[in-house]
From Swiss-Prot:
It holds the Pfam family TPP1. Its main location: nucleus. GO terms for molecular function: DNA/RNA helicase activity; GTPase activity; telomeric DNA binding. This is Telomere replication protein EST3. The keyword Nucleus applies. One of its GO terms (biological process) is telomere maintenance via telomerase. It is found in: Nucleus; Chromosome, Telomere. Component of the telomerase complex involved in telomere replication. Stimulates RNA/DNA heteroduplex unwinding which favors the telomere replication by the telomerase.
Length: 180
């Protein structure tokens, strides 16, 4: 007999900070590249983000890291998610350096499924061959059959840990690319 899930539990959320924004962001910026999509976070506000109305008001500041793919020339290539979709991303060398000196640990060390606050991010695009190089063949296979010559990804220049709990997703979160 399958487990009984009460109606109140069927809409459970992983975090009150995660909201669906990735798909809308991509639809808004479909015609442009290298545009700023997430504003910079003042480091003083980042130390107590829950008291900052400016940070909390922008849903795009909050993501979870779902997987790390590769480190290349001090950039870290990963996938991040909101409450509904995943998107490929690059943590820039500046972001990685600042994160690691502030936290005294590697950005890739025990941070999968950790809630992050990000800032100073823009949207970039990559051709499939570049994608294969940075994210691997498995990711490229996701784009077979999609009519997308360029794949958008998030370029993140600021990252702060908001919550160290590594709560796994209740359900599989799909990549956003088939929905745009």
């Amino acid at each position: 007999m399958p487990p009984f899930i009460p109606k109140s539990r069927s809409n459970a959320v992983e975090s009150v900070y995660l909201h669906g924004w990735v798909r809308d962001m991509l639809l808004e910026s479909k015609t442009s590249q290298n545009i700023a999509v997430i504003p910079r976070v003042d480091p003083d506000e980042a130390s107590i983000p829950l008291l900052s109305r400016r940070i909390y008001a922008n849903r795009r500041h909050f993501v979870k890291i779902t997987k790390f793919f590769q480190v290349h020339n001090y950039s870290v290539y990963a996938s991040v998610k909101d409450s509904q979709h995943q998107i490929l991303s690059q943590f820039t060398p500046k972001c990685v350096s600042e994160f690691e000196s502030r936290n005294r640990s590697r950005i890739t060390s025990d941070t999968v499924n950790t809630l992050f606050m990000i800032g100073d991010a823009k949207l970039g695009i990559m051709v499939v061959d570049e994608l294969r190089h940075y994210f691997g063949e498995k990711i490229v296979s996701l784009f077979n059959g999609l009519d997308m010559p360029y794949i958008p990804y998030l370029i993140i220049n600021q990252a702060f840990i908001l919550d160290y709990d590594q709560v796994e997703a209740f359900k599989m979160t799909p990549f956003v690319y088939q929905y745009i």
